[in-house]
């Protein structure tokens, strides 16, 4: 591949308008404006009369970009450009120097006015597309001309299809494999989701070269058996030589500190023990490295041991990386791809990438279509060309490469190619560049201040190849003279354009660094805003001088986790922030659940359960307050039901969306939030969901079908469709937190980049051949190809850094530390040279803290860059009226909903922020005890070593839910249940025996037995809701808990955010026995190896530790409130029988009464808790 092309600074009026032209536009150099000016040249025919016989019309100029947002921006900018040029021609002058210069090139003003006016009128027929909409348009054109039928439905987001395909692959192929192989696979892939996350990059890479041909389970098993044979062969060889190895090594002049007598005996014994064991997996002892030829020669004086074959074999077996990981990747990619093709064909679906493949094949095959496109679009622009892939490039290259009467502009910036995760391929760009003799570049920066431009120039001029690849050069930008006065000042002192915040420690872990830099970032922003309050922090931009506000500051991150870290620190200092890259589905908000309750109630207004659910929603808060009143009147009930019938009629007549709008308007006056902003957000979400429901209703005949679709959307946790993401409400001053990916193309006066030194080394050996630029995958994960893959990862990290830095107009603060990814004894150097920022500063060399500090000092000598260590802790105080913004911010960042209405449960209240060290140790010891016990009792199947965990608890609850039909169930039914919950069917007889004992064990002296409870006298899994009217605080609830059970003072305190709204839960069983109502809760907790561990002493300890006394208090309140409404002369002491907690693992014999806990909650405490809550 040719490395260097000739380069020339772009002159808009001199660049020829024929052939393929590549223009590289660095960040801030006016790429879009360049497209506008070239577009105007084509419209007005300036300079190219020989090539184009007539001036081009707007529909003849093709403009292609990669996102809808970019398409909309281009449309607006081109339309505005035409308007401005039109006004310039009318007025014969303009204040814009570019248009004034353009005006001088026009010879016939009247003709130009006519052309521009026509272009303005024709803009609705302009040919501005995304790459995928362009493909779709051409294929439809092909359909028209060839009477072909293009019936496929285009899907924009294929994530759910990929997941479905992966799950299908997982079931079909993994479930049928031998257990030994499944265990090996499970070490690398825990679930279909995990597998998909690993292999997804392969689906974006076209024409990847796979070396292996394992395409079925039979070949996979053979491959596994070959690996096992190699390991067995080595083991046998070791057992032959192991007795003479110690003597052989001792006879060498070897380093006795490492190869001491003690170490040799210990190592040899461990390896020998392994060699004698059965070979079921690919485990190789790491200590075998001491017996490799290379290591022994390294530690001997004469450097020779070549005559000993065992040392050579040790080296070979360690080099051979035994794994199924890479084989599974290739196997899965091919099978899942086949499944996708089959599924798409079956459902007549087509993905965006399929459009590209189809169009490329069609153009290659049919010359008529190719000629038709060229005739239709004699000029074309490909915007953001650095984000292309090989298929996209081939399409446009085929169309325009040999045509001298057309022009194709490829415009982009390879330094900003950061979208490899979705298929963009920088190597396709480099390939295109290698085919072009001369490329043009833009170098005037119109965005940033002079000092920012100089500092970024200086930073990226430190290395010969700052972006690693030689054909991605850094051309220093020239700041526009118009930006001379642009500045950021505090107390009238100009701030250094780039500040590095360096943590003063020689070794820093990523976790410690993230905590430290988050605080530094929040503290500095707090300081700026505090200064701004007194008018001491100012910014001067193109629009003049103004006081700094939160809106002027952006924090750039890679992902949601980093955003959360920053938001938490900002919140501590009372600073409002919005995470602009929120991609959560609107269906996963509390508002969606509330709206579902309301719609369900509208369909069945007289259904009491649905009515009460809908009253839990904020939008019907006023009505719910009436319903919750104990003295509810028939008149009020009638009014509520009438209102729901009214909404039903509106829905019937004008649709669900209009009905939701009317409902919102009616209840707007009954504000359900402390401030209007949160009210606005909630309304925004309701309307958003209303639009989606209205759109979906066209596919259903009945309202109930729409409700079921809505229910499924809420319950299914999948990636949101393009139109389902939460719409950000962004009107008030707030710090913008945004991902670097999403920030591309945007600009901010002040930028913070806290986490620029973090990196993830490449774990997939996907790499490009530097000559052919083809993509390969090395299944053996050899160091050579992993190194190439990681170099490509590092190159993109540097491009990430460039994109992040160039978002800033006036100032950029960056975090930095001597990051150590893996602690190694006596290690001096950090790992940051493997990050984009570390490479740029250190030139790719490893350095310690002192070396890094020295480099930073050299960078800071010209006053463009400064180094800081710590910021003071400022707490930024807001004005009272901005409280509403907190509400807004918390809503948009769902993990931090505070001081707002919500639905909670015992489980949520019971969550502790951090376990004490003592408790962590206790849990760890218990888990170890369980594992050891399991190992000892593997041959003996009892309820005490029955599989543990959540799935077992769910299974037992499911079985006992079917209590009254268990008598009719045979062993096959129980086996099916075990399989359903992924538990081996060998436990069938144990399970049957266990369940039989459970349902026949007396709960007390009155002989309450589950099997004797009448079905009509019980309710299973009773769901309850009751309001928390007063704000509930954890401190107050802790006092109640301690008064219920004084020993609970020894357990960790509850710690939750103040909550108000609804308390919900499920009671396993409520039943009547001898005219009294009882609560029963099943507990599948494992407390010990036999029945003795379920004595009253042990159970009471478990009750305290898990805070079950709070749980049964809540359950009792729920049933008490329920019975108050249902029974006329209800009395707690006379009608309520108490609470049973049934510890099921104790029930190994019906005659023993261990495992049963009973209590009759104190009525005064019940009242006290009820008063606290409501």
Swiss-Prot record:
Mg(2+) binds at residues 957, 1068, 1081. Residues 900-1174 are annotated as: Nuclease activity, interacts with RecD and RecA. It comes from the Bacteria. GO terms for molecular function: 3'-5' DNA helicase activity; ATP binding; ATP hydrolysis activity; DNA binding; exodeoxyribonuclease V activity; magnesium ion binding. It holds the Pfam family UvrD_C. The active site is at residue 1081. GO terms for biological process: double-strand break repair via homologous recombination. Residues 4-449 form the UvrD-like helicase ATP-binding domain. It catalyses: Exonucleolytic cleavage (in the presence of ATP) in either 5'- to 3'- or 3'- to 5'-direction to yield 5'-phosphooligonucleotides; Couples ATP hydrolysis with the unwinding of duplex DNA by translocating in the 3'-5' direction; ATP + H2O = ADP + phosphate + H(+). PANTHER family: RECBCD ENZYME SUBUNIT RECB, UVRD / RECB / PCRA DNA HELICASE FAMILY MEMBER. NCBIfam families: recB. Belongs to the helicase family. UvrD subfamily. In the RecBCD complex, RecB has a slow 3'-5' helicase, an exonuclease activity and loads RecA onto ssDNA, RecD has a fast 5'-3' helicase activity, while RecC stimulates the ATPase and processivity of the RecB helicase and contributes to recognition of the Chi site. This is RecBCD enzyme subunit RecB. The lineage of its organism: Bacteria, Pseudomonadati, Pseudomonadota, Gammaproteobacteria, Enterobacterales.
């Amino acid at each position: 591949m040719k490395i260097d092309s000739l380069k020339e600074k772009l002159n808009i009026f001199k660049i020829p308008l024929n052939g393929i032209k590549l223009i590289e536009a660095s960040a801030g150099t006016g790429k879009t404006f360049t497209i506008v000016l070239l577009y105007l040249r084509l419209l007005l025919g300036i300079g190219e009369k020989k090539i184009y016989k007539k001036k081009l019309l707007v529909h003849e100029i093709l403009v292609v970009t990669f996102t809808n947002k970019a398409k909309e921006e281009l449309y607006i900018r081109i339309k505005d450009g035409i308007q401005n040029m039109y006004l310039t021609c009318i007025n014969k002058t303009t204040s814009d120097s570019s248009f004034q210069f353009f005006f001088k090139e026009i010879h016939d003003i009247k003709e130009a006015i006519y052309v521009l006016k026509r272009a303005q009128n024709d803009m609705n027929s302009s040919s501005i597309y995304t790459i995928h909409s362009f493909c779709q348009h051409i294929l439809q054109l092909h359909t028209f001309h060839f009477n072909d039928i293009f019936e496929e439905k285009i899907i924009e987001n294929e994530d759910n299809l990929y997941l479905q395909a992966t799950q299908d692959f997982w079931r079909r192929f993994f479930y049928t494999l031998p257990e030994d192989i499944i265990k090996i696979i499970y070490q690398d892939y825990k679930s279909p989701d995990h597998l998909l996350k690993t292999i997804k990059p392969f689906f974006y890479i076209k024409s990847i070269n796979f070396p292996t041909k394992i395409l079925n389970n039979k070949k996979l098993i053979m491959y596994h058996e070959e690996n096992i044979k190699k390991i067995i062969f080595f083991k046998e060889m070791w057992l032959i030589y192991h007795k003479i190895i110690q003597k052989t090594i001792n006879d060498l002049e070897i380093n006795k500190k490492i190869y001491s007598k003690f170490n040799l005996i210990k190592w040899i014994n461990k390896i020998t023990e392994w060699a004698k064991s059965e070979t079921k997996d690919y485990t190789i002892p790491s200590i075998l490295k001491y017996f490799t030829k290379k290591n022994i020669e390294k530690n001997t004086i004469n450097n020779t041991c070549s005559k000993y074959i065992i040392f050579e074999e040790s080296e070979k077996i360690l080099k051979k990386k035994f794994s199924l990981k890479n084989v599974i990747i290739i196997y899965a990619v091919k099978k899942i791809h086949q499944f996708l093709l089959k599924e798409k064909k079956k459902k007549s679906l087509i993905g965006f990438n399929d459009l590209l493949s189809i169009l490329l094949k069609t153009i290659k095959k049919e010359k008529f279509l190719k000629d038709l496109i060229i005739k239709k679009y004699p000029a074309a622009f490909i915007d953001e060309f650095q984000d292309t892939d090989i298929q996209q490039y081939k399409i446009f290259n085929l169309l325009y490469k040999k045509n001298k009467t057309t022009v194709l502009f490829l415009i982009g910036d390879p330094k900003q190619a950061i979208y490899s995760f979705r298929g963009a391929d920088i190597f396709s760009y480099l390939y295109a560049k290698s085919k072009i003799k001369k490329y043009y570049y833009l170098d005037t920066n119109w965005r940033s201040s002079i000092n920012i431009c100089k500092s970024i120039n200086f930073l990226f001029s430190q290395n010969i190849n700052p972006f690693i690849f030689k054909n991605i050069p850094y051309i220093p930008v020239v700041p526009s003279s118009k930006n001379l006065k642009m500045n950021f000042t505090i107390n009238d002192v100009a701030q250094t354009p780039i500040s590095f915040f360096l943590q003063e420690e020689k070794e820093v872990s990523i976790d410690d660094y993230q905590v430290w830099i988050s605080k530094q970032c929040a503290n500095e922003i707090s300081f700026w805003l505090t200064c701004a309050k007194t008018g001491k922090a100012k910014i001067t931009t193109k629009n003049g001088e103004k006081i700094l506000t939160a809106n002027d500051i952006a924090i750039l991150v890679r992902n949601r986790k980093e955003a959360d870290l920053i938001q938490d620190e900002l919140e501590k200092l009372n600073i409002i922030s919005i995470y602009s890259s929120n991609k959560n589905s609107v269906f996963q908000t509390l508002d969606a659940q509330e709206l579902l309750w309301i719609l369900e109630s509208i369909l069945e207004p007289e259904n009491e359960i649905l009515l009460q659910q809908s009253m839990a929603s904020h939008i019907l808060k006023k009505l719910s307050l009436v319903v919750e009143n104990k003295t509810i009147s028939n008149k009020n009930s009638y009014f509520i039901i009438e209102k729901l019938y009214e909404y039903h009629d509106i829905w019937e007549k004008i649709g669900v969306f209009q009905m939701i709008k009317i409902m919102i308007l009616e209840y707007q006056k009954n504000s359900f939030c402390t401030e209007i902003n949160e009210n606005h957000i909630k309304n925004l979400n309701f309307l958003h969901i209303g639009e989606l429901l209205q759109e979906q209703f066209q596919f259903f005949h009945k309202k109930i079908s729409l409700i079921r679709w809505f229910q499924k959307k809420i319950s299914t946790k999948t990636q949101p469709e393009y139109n389902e993401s939460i719409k950000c409400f962004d009107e008030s001053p707030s710090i913008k937190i945004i991902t670097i990916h999403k920030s591309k193309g945007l600009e901010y006066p002040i930028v913070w980049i806290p986490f620029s030194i973090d990196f993830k080394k490449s774990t997939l050996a996907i790499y490009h051949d530097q000559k052919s630029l083809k993509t390969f995958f090395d299944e053996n994960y050899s160091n050579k190809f992993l190194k190439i893959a990681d170099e490509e990862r590092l190159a993109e990290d540097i491009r990430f850094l460039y994109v992040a830095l160039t978002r800033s107009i006036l100032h950029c603060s960056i975090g930095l530390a001597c990051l150590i990814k893996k602690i190694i004894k006596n290690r001096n150097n950090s790992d940051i040279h493997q990050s984009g920022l570390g490479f740029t500063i250190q030139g790719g060399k490893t350095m310690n803290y002192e070396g890094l500090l020295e480099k930073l000092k050299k960078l800071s000598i010209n006053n463009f860059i400064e180094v800081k260590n710590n910021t003071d802790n400022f707490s930024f105080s807001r004005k009272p009226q901005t409280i509403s913004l907190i509400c807004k911010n918390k809503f948009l960042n769902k993990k931090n909903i505070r001081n707002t209405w919500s639905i909670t449960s015992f489980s949520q209240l019971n969550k502790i922020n951090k376990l004490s060290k003592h408790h962590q140790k206790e849990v760890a010891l218990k888990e170890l005890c369980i594992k050891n016990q399991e190992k000892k009792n593997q041959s003996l199947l009892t309820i005490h070593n029955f599989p543990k965990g959540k799935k077992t608890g769910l299974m037992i609850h499911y079985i006992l839910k079917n209590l009254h039909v268990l008598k009719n169930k045979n062993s096959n039914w129980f086996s099916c249940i075990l399989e359903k919950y992924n538990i081996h069917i060998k436990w069938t007889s144990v399970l049957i025996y266990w369940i039989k004992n459970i349902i026949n064990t007396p709960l007390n002296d009155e002989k309450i037995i589950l099997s004797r409870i009448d079905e009509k006298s019980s309710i299973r899994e009773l769901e309850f809701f009751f309001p928390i009217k007063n704000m509930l605080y954890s401190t107050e609830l802790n006092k109640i808990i301690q008064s219920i059970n004084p020993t609970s003072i020894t357990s960790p305190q509850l710690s939750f955010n103040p909550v108000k709204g609804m308390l919900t839960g499920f009671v396993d069983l409520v039943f009547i026995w001898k005219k009294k109502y009882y609560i029963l809760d099943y507990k599948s907790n494992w407390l010990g190896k036999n029945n003795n561990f379920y004595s009253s002493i042990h159970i009471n300890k478990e009750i305290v530790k898990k805070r079950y006394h709070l749980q049964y208090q809540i359950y009792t309140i729920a049933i008490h409130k329920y019975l108050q409404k249902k029974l006329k002369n209800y009395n707690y002491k006379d009608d309520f029988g108490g609470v049973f907690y049934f510890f099921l693992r104790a029930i190994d014999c019906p005659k023993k009464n261990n495992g049963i806990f009973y209590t009759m909650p104190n009525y005064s405490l019940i009242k006290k808790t009820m008063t606290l809550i409501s």
